[in-house]
Amino acid sequence: MALWRGSACAGFLALAVGCVFLLEPELPGTALRSLWSSLRLGPAPVPVGPLSPESRLAAAWDALIAQPARRWRRVAVGVNACVDVVISGVKLLQALGLSPGSGKDHAILHSRSDLEEAFLYFMGKGAAAERFFSDKETFHDIAQAASEFPGAQHYVGGNAALIGQRFAANTDLKVLLCGPIGPKLHELLDDNVFVPPESLQEEDEFHLILEYLAGEEWGPFKAPHANRFIFSHDLSNGAMNMLEVFVSSLEEFQPDLVVLSGLHMMEGQSKELQRKRLLEVVTAISDIPTGIPVHLELASMTNRELMSSIVHQQVFPAVASLGLNEQELLFLSQSASGPHSSLSSWDGVPDVGMVSDILFWILKEHGRSENRASDLTRIHFHTLVYHILATVDGHWANQLAAVAAGARVAGTQACATETIDTNRVSLRAPQEFTTSHLESGSRIVLNPDKPVVEWHREGITFHFTPVLVCKDPVRTVGLGDAISAEGLFYSEARPD
């Protein structure tokens, strides 16, 4: 009976509140909330505001990302590996007694002064770069100072090792890694990464990663984005010494995907050695059984002749897939007289239409077609604020999920979170863009609820998605490698 009276009382009180709403619609909201609370019927429901574009986009990705029907079981990765010593670039250069002068790029670093100038040049642009340091003794002194510097951190480094580490996070995958692997690197590697005994060596190869924050200043230079400058005196990786070990390991390992990187490390070698080694790379790739796709991960380069040789000396036709960023894409086009090659550098965010034109040209000129015996059918392009996956129709499946997964991992890895933290990322991709500048491209308006945009051009399909950029990145090194690995993990190669 008491229960019935309580329910009736609540009903009458609710009716009374309804009458107040009806008769006094102008009554302030605070007064109504106070009245509601005083009736002890619980707090008034707080209206839920609209979700942020970042929250909508992250939720849409999660709904889109699905496993491929046929998944990789065994992945072989080679051939560059090292220990990354990560440190504040400005603090290290100050500790070395250097002061900020004028920024200037150097294709090869010969001195501390060259290092200071090149670091400032790229810091001022907020762009990533990698250079070879020619003087062994000077590099050793700098590396020792960096390694012992307070706050210096040691990580797995080298594109192949970083890609292998990312794949190894999937425990149902078996991962083979070949490269010059010393004791420190071996200690840092995931237990799921198998290293052939022939890859082990007594000393590690060290790469110095000079990081800077967005807005960080040194002298007259201010970084527009957080990024890093990488340099090394790396002879094992530079000569691709582990290439033969890598190829000889494949027969026993029996991979269903091969990932190759490290060609950029040859920039410190003579032209004769570069030419000889590239031919050996092509021969090695040709020995991999038909039906096993090979992905080539490119990295920062300055030698146009080397890049042109990679494009033209049968390396591109021998691989099925490419991974590269905006600097490598434009440099590739400049080296091989491709579209928009008169552009000296990107002005801010790379134009989507221009990027699309260059990707189209690579696949049309060097990819598979009825008239060309090439294996190249896929390119995964990544820049800070968006990614594009371009594929020749009929050869790859699940690319919508693959491009979304690659973009998602960019946000989680940079912020060092398991999932996207929408409070720590921002949507910076262009809200509108044209898909081509060389023909009448479509006009696209970005919709966070449908974050993957697809368009087609003469038998080539493009998948575009924005990136949720980490506002306060914990670590920028290896993002491109993680992006490419994640995109490959979700990709499915269709059998010929």
Swiss-Prot record:
InterPro entries: ADP_PFK/GK, Ribokinase-like. Keywords: Glycolysis, Kinase, Magnesium, Metal-binding, Secreted, Signal, Transferase. PROSITE patterns: ADPK. It is found in: Secreted. The active site is at D481. Residues 52-496 form the ADPK domain. Pathway: Carbohydrate degradation; glycolysis. Mg(2+) binds at E297, E328, D481. Optimum pH is 5.75-6.5 and 8.75-9.0. Disulfide bonds: none annotated. It catalyses: D-glucose + ADP = D-glucose 6-phosphate + AMP + H(+). Residues 1-22 form the signal peptide. Binds 1 Mg(2+) ion per subunit. SUPFAM superfamilies: Ribokinase-like. GO terms for cellular component: extracellular region. GO terms for molecular function: ADP-specific glucokinase activity; metal ion binding. Its cofactor is Mg(2+). GO terms for biological process: glucose metabolic process; glycolytic process. Its EC number is 2.7.1.147. Gene3D superfamilies: 3.40.1190.20. Monomer. Catalyzes the phosphorylation of D-glucose to D-glucose 6-phosphate using ADP as the phosphate donor. GDP and CDP can replace ADP, but with reduced efficiency. Belongs to the ADP-dependent glucokinase family. This is ADP-dependent glucokinase. It comes from Mus musculus. The gene is Adpgk.
